[in-house]
Amino acid sequence: MSSSQAVRSSKYSYRATSTGPGTADVNIEYIQDLSSLSRLEDKIRLLQDDLEVERELRQRIEREKADLSVQVIQMSERLEEAEGGAEHQFEANRKRDAELLKLRKLLEDVHLESEETTLLLKKKHNEIITDFQEQVEILTKNKARAEKDKAKFQTEVYELLSQIESYNKEKIVSEKHISKLEVSISELNVKIEELNRTVIDISSHRSRLSQENIELTKDVQDLKVQLDTVSFSKSQVISQLEDARRRLEDEDRRRSLLESSLHQVEIELDSVRNQLEEESEARIDLERQLVKANADATSWQNKWNSEVAARAEEVEEIRRKYQVRITELEEHIESLIVKVNNLEKMKTRLASEVEVLIIDLEKSNNSCRELTKSVNTLEKHNVELKSRLDETIILYETSQRDLKNKHADLVRTVHELDKVKDNNNQLTRENKKLGDDLHEAKGAINELNRRLHELELELRRLENERDELTAAYKEAEAGRKAEEQRGQRLAADFNQYRHDAERRLAEKDEEIEAIRKQTSIEIEQLNARVIEAETRLKTEVTRIKKKLQIQITELEMSLDVANKTNIDLQKVIKKQSLQLTELQAHYEDVQRQLQATLDQYAVAQRRLAGLNGELEEVRSHLDSANRAKRTVELQYEEAASRINELTTANVSLVSIKSKLEQELSVVASDYEEVSKELRISDERYQKVQVELKHVVEQVHEEQERIVKLETIKKSLEVEVKNLSIRLEEVELNAVAGSKRIISKLEARIRDLELELEEEKRRHAETIKILRKKERTVKEVLVQCEEDQKNLILLQDALDKSTAKINIYRRQLSEQEGVSQQTTTRVRRFQRELEAAEDRADTAESSLNIIRAKHRTFVTTSTVPGSQVYIQETTRTITE
């Protein structure tokens, strides 16, 4: 509880009469601090509070005594009931001994508390005596200070009286000075009236000059307006000239551009003409070729009508192709003709534009000449206006000089008038200041007299209070002696009470130490568990990190290998595709050659059937067919070798596919292991969260306990305040016969304060433990968040690896599709080759049959371009 302090102020006024003209009143304020009385009142209230608390404690002890007596009776009954069991009797005896020991300790605690209360009362009594002595010393010091202040105030009063006399003398001197200044003011007023008359004359003359000046300024403004119009017309003419020049330059540029475009168009026309000529020549060549082809066609038609019937479709296709090509060429020629016509139109249009531009140029040149003439005339007019303006400016400057001189005279007169007015104002201000000073000095003298009177009154009051304090001091000494006697009486009771209180304190200390040991053991166990959990988490996290890093490195290695194999496979596929395209082209050539040979062979058969004279040509065709066959065989061998290469490549692809599938299975197993480890880590994380929740619940329980203690403390404070209010009402009745109870209550309060301090220490320790636990919880949460982040990163890496694996699977499937396509193509080529071989075999068999029927001898010369002589012998077999 906070002690309230009261301040009492006493005022004394002294009135003194001096030999001077005025009286002085002096006021002295003296403040006395009554903190000692307030302290005593607070102590009395505290003692009353302790009395009530001690009464409550006594009632509680009596209740406990009654409860214990009831328990003793119950225990005796139980002992009578359980006489048969020796062990039960021993336990009951032990419990009874323990309860008796507790009661003895309580009695010892009461004795100790009483001794402590007596010591406290002695200390309080000594403190009260010292406080009274200090108050007496303070009062004596205050009295000495008051006497010193009185002497100072008297000296100040004498000084003020001397100042008043000096002020009166200065007042007489200032009144004389004021009369002199009034005479000078009247003279200055006469001068001011004369100056006003001269100012009126000067102002009339100034108005005349201003009117003349206004007229001259109007003339100057008119001339300026004319000049502005002339300059504006000049600027317009110059701008028109510049526009004309710009137009001329633009026209020149356009003309040059048009000439360059014309030149380009002519070049393009020449190139188009050359193209037309080339196209016409190509058309003529094509027509010649067509004529030749038509002639060949007619000759072939005349020769082999039967062949035309057989190959009518091929001829129609060739005709269609030629017709399509002819139509394309005709369309191209028509487009070229259209381009030529467009270019000729452009040329004519550009020529017309050039003519129009030439006409515009001539017009602009004529307008330029006219504008130059008008500019020359304007410049002449401008020179005349400038000469007039110079004359008017000279007149204006002379008039301004005269006006400035007159204005300077007027300013001087006005300045003198202002000085006179300022002097007058200063004199009036000084007069007012002197009057105000006189009034203030009179007021200060009256205030000093009043303060002297107040100081005398305060001195009288202080003397009366001194007498009262001496009487109170005597009464306090008598009360002190009585209280000392009472304190000696209470000392014995207090010693007994203190002895009992010490015993109780020892028991409570033992209980507190046991509780502290238990709490410290629990805290150490919790810390050990937290440390073990942290170490386990850290080891598991490091192990998982290491495993995942190893797996990531393995995955990266496998990815690099897969990328390399993919690149190699892509290169092989590209090579194979190029080889396949080459094979296809070569095979198409072979097919064409085979078709040509077959066509030739069919023609030979028809000729042999129809014409025996064409056997030599058939033989030549046979030779060519043999050659083609050899080439085909060679190509077949090459194709077979390429097919073997493709099969080996396909086998390698299949092996690579199997390897990739194995790697995929390994990656899948790794993925399953990682997912299992992730599940294990999630379970551990959940366990850690459960432990954290348990720790948080414990923290909340501790906080609730602290809140309960604070509420109990607040309720106790409220009860103490209420009791203090009640005790203030019953102060006088409770102080008389309650010293012994007060001593016991003070001892009890000390015990409660000690318990409070111990509770505060426990509270501080629990808060420290809570903070440590909160730190550990935060660290665990941070580690959990880091683990979650690592898990997220690992999941991202796994997703990326799965995506890459899917990409590899797609690439593998695409490669498989490509390999299947290549195998189908190879099989198709093999089938076509087998069909060609069958055809060649049939042709050979038919040729052998023909040879058997007809024998031909071919004689050829080695000279190129020589004729072939065929000697044919027919043999008919008749049976």
From Swiss-Prot:
One of its GO terms (cellular component) is myosin complex. GO terms for biological process: actomyosin structure organization; cortical actin cytoskeleton organization; embryonic morphogenesis; mesoderm development; mitotic cytokinesis; myofibril assembly; regulation of actin cytoskeleton organization; regulation of cell junction assembly. It is found in: Cytoplasm, Myofibril. Expressed in all larval and adult muscle tissues. Expression is five times higher in tubular than in fibrillar muscles. Keywords: Coiled coil, Cytoplasm, Disulfide bond, Motor protein, Muscle protein, Myosin, Phosphoprotein, Thick filament. Residues 32-858 form a coiled coil. Residues 1-31, 859-879 are annotated as: Nonhelical region. The more-acidic and less-abundant isoform is phosphorylated. The modification Phosphoserine is found at S18. One of its GO terms (molecular function) is Rho-dependent protein serine/threonine kinase activity. Belongs to the paramyosin family. Heterodimer of two isoforms. Paramyosin is a major structural component of many thick filaments isolated from invertebrate muscles. This is Paramyosin, long form. The lineage of its organism: Eukaryota, Metazoa, Ecdysozoa, Arthropoda, Hexapoda. The gene is Prm.
